[in-house]
Amino acid sequence: RTDFLRNFYRKYEGAPVLQVDEDSLEMFNEFILAKSFPAAIRRVREHRALGHRTLLITGALDFVVQPLKPLFDEILAPSLEINGGKYSGRMTHVPPIGETRAAALRSYADENNLDLKESIAYADSTSDLPMLEAVGFPVAVNPETKLATLARRRGWLVENFQPISGSPKKTLPLGSKKE
């Protein structure tokens, strides 16, 4: 998955930072809000209302998830190198995926004096298993089949959040447009 992201993010090579910043809100609306789950947003707000510290650890680039900043106390996301006002297409550090995500969580907990055994983590993929295993209250949300099976076997909470009804669905063209 890390190699996939590295290759995918190379497509940003030469992209002007200012233009990408302007486009990031549109990207957010198209890729994030189109998959938005109101229950997930409510859940984060409930955690904050209870005084819980909220952290989003994601493999999505920082400028893509920046509009979520008001919802979370902190966001850990990969960044791209910048040279002369343009993105290089190279990440500044390894994206937080798999064990790297769990290590980022442990590091964050250490730096902020947090007890992971009293913490909750939400995830949908088996690649997030190390992070889920690091906390006292793991939750599989809209999990892939393998994670759902494992979570149930381990007695973890499994939740299925529903997307916004009427969300725009991106479709691929079936052929070239007719003139």
Where are these regions (language model features)?
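N-terminal helical cap/lid subdomain that shapes the substrate entry/recognition surface
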Residues: 1-13
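C-terminal cap/substrate-recognition subdomain and adjoining C-terminal extension
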Residues: 17, 22-23, 29-179
